[in-house]
């Protein structure tokens, strides 16, 4: 039996990601599911599945982020957190020495520069791609699928390339 927990959910353009953590900040459950355009249904299914293992009335707080995070937060009574802030805080929690965060999302790519002042996280700067989605995760996912590779294997192959192409920018 599990005690109290905190819930975080990222509803993106390609996937829904969920994490449940105990009050000490230890990850109890982590899930990544491609939603195939069914963002709301996928998110609710994940919450229902989580409820089978963790009583949802034991949830101390729920925070939502990403493209579909605001609507879900409003409908479920949770908090909405801007994804740049969520990524910076999450990275700082698990890897406080990190100063550069690169997020390759389904619709955009972000570069987030973070620092620390007086023992607190500071977002120093961030930038997003201004070009088409060719340099983002959904494009890479589509190309992997076209070539018959799972995206996880596709990225491993890319790291072995001796002449990587410039995709966008």
Residue ranges and their predicted role:
Residues 116, 122-163, 168:
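Glycine-rich phosphate-binding loop plus the immediately following alpha-helix
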Residues 6, 10, 64-66, 103-104, ...:
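Short glycine/serine/threonine-biased micro-segments
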Residues 1-2, 68-115, 119:
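Conserved phosphate-binding catalytic cores of ATP/NTP-utilizing and phosphoryl-transfer enzymes
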Residues 42-45, 49, 71, 90-93, ...:
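Alpha-helical scaffold segments in soluble metabolic enzymes
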Residues 5-7, 25-26, 60-62, 78-79, ...:
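Structural motif
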Residues 15-18, 106-112, 136:
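Short glycine/serine/threonine-rich phosphate/pyrophosphate-binding segments
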Residues 1-83:
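N-terminal glycine/serine-rich phosphate-binding loop of ATP-dependent small-molecule kinases
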Residues 32-38, 84-90, 129-133:
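Short, acidic/turn-prone active-site loops that include or flank metal/cofactor-
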